[in-house]
Regions:
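Generic secondary-structure signature for well-ordered alpha-helical cores
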Residues: 23, 27, 132-136, 191-195, ...
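General small-molecule cofactor/ligand-binding pocket signal
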Residues: 31, 200-202, 249
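Oxyanion-binding "anion nests"
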Residues: 182-209, 213-215
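Conserved active-site and cofactor/substrate-binding residues in soluble primary-metabolism enzymes
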Residues: 9, 13, 118-125, 180-187, ...
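Short Gly/Pro-enriched turn/cap motifs at secondary-structure boundaries
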Residues: 177-181, 204-207, 263-267
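C-terminal active-site/capping subdomain that shapes the small-molecule cofactor and substrate pocket
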Residues: 217-319
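N-terminal Rossmann-like NAD(P) cofactor-binding subdomain of oxidoreductases
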Residues: 1-177, 267, 278-280, 315
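Alpha-helical scaffold segments in soluble metabolic enzymes
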Residues: 17, 65, 125, 129, ...
């Protein structure tokens, strides 16, 4: 069977990656809207309603507008929205199959799936299991930071790193951003973990194209019961047992580090996320490493599409 796919916003960073990852798949037919008609609502509506699957790779307002073009009674066309517009909307299913035991089936049956944000993906993979198991109290004063490649900033940021000639020292240095502490991923980070309060989140962009690590520090004395890093490693290993796209790394950090370092790029060009637990009796650091353009964006979207179409969820994806 051939499925018709329309990528609305095909020329953005995520749209291009989805297009690239779907290229050559015999069961997928990409519907291509003429360049001069991309912003014509009437023409776009024709493509949306002709498709089996629509990927929305657009700003929030444009995503909402595209969803509104679905014809009344059309229950066949299914949406995967890569924007932040619908991630906490009750009528949309959150597109993280590994979230809990029932999430994959919810995605399979959904007409509208919201693809998680990249930073949020890592934070939720770490904190949702811990909060739902009662290890981390819901009112825990959570904080998190992430370092990501500049491709996560879209075309303008990519150009600032790749087309500006020789970079100055400020651009070579890792740079904190979203210092107003109101990053757009925060609502889903709270909603999908069960935390009573938004975490204090400090993202960092680095002078490398893609790859990321999201880290969450934990103080055992503030947790619901005493745990060590090895306990959390075992907990994660059990929680994510059987998950193809999430791998829990060994408790002994030496074999999984590079001379003591944890590089952000080791999962690039895959749809794999790696979970780590480091620390000692008084302090723990849990971390998730993955490709911000893979499990953090286009790979996650395609994984969900595969599930929705009843295909092997890793079809077309490297893990």
């Amino acid at each position: 069977m051939t499925y018709k796919v329309f990528i609305d916003g095909r020329h953005g960073t995520t749209g291009l990656k989805i297009d690239e990852r779907l290229a050559g798949r015999d069961e997928i037919e990409i519907l291509t809207i003429p360049e001069d008609k991309r912003k014509d609502p009437a023409v776009k509506a024709e493509y949306i309603n002709a498709a089996d699957v629509v990927f929305l790779c657009l700003p929030d307002a444009a995503s909402k507008e595209s969803v509104s073009l679905l014809a009344a009674g059309n229950t066949r066309t299914r949406f995967l929205d890569a924007s932040t517009a619908h991630r906490t909307h009750p009528d949309w299913v959150y597109g993280l199959p590994e979230l809990n035991a029932g999430q994959r089936e919810r995605i399979r049956n959904a007409q509208k799936v919201a693809v998680p944000g990249c930073h949020a993906s890592g934070f939720i993979m770490l904190m949702h299991p811990l909060v739902s198991a009662g290890i981390v109290p819901a009112d825990y004063p959570a904080s998190t930071y992430s370092i990501t490649g500049y491709s996560g900033g879209g075309k303008e940021m990519i150009a600032s790193y790749e087309e500006a000639g020789a970079l100055g020292d400020n651009m070579k240095s890792p740079r904190f951003y979203a210092l107003g502490l109101s990053h757009k991923h925060l609502p889903e980070m709270q909603a999908m973990t069960g935390l009573a309060h938004k975490p204090l989140f400090t993202p960092i962009v680095g002078n490398f194209a893609q790859g990321m690590v999201v880290a969450v520090p934990l103080l055992p004395r503030l947790l619901s019961r005493p745990v060590a890093a090895a306990d959390l490693q075992q907990f994660f290993a059990q929680y994510y047992a059987g998950q193809t796209c999430v791998q829990v790394m060994p408790a002994d950090p030496a074999p999984v580090l590079e001379n003591g370092f944890l590089p952000a790029t080791a999962c690039n060009d895959t749809n794999r996320a790696e979970i780590f637990a480091f620390g000692h009796a008084d302090q723990i650091l849990v971390a998730a490493r993955f490709d911000n353009l893979g499990k953090g964006a286009s790979g996650a979207a395609i994984q969900c599409m595969n599930i929705m179409l009843g295909l092997d969820e890793t079809t077309g994806l490297a893990v």
